């Protein structure tokens, strides 16, 4: 992101107030990280230049198309065209009145069409108060961050056999899944894994010990609470 003010809450994470410097430094960092088979995520896409109120319904960023293209998008475009950046993280804020993470013209037309990014987009930490899951998937946002079980179940409803069967949503889900899987399978995240690999979940001795200790402490706390309540009742009865 761009330094609009020296008082920005996360200026320490961003490179510069200049889009070219920001973009070229970002491209160099992306190139170095991806050369090791790791997937860096360029963020926050886009025009997320303040922390105050950014996640309370989505801070509204008002700007012209010229400013958006020449300043804010340029810092993201350079890592993509210079270093083939594969991933971006969308922002909490809105562009005008539309959340950046569900903006079709931004995520599909510009990011995939004009800039040519082939990987996947992921949201910032998911906030269901204004981030609508279906809208973001259809717009081209592939991987909602911090999803939990009921969120996944809700998306399944849009499949062919779901209660909300919708071919457009189903196709968008397939496209998103393909982008995520294709990107990850071409990273080092799949090193040493083949179709014959079997993943086995095992608990270590210290995990088992910690779980037993937690249960024991929980039981002792419950017993202590009951004893305190009973003692209080006895003292009250004596009075």
Model-identified regions with their sequence ranges:
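Glycoside hydrolase catalytic-domain context in secreted enzymes
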Residues: 1-239
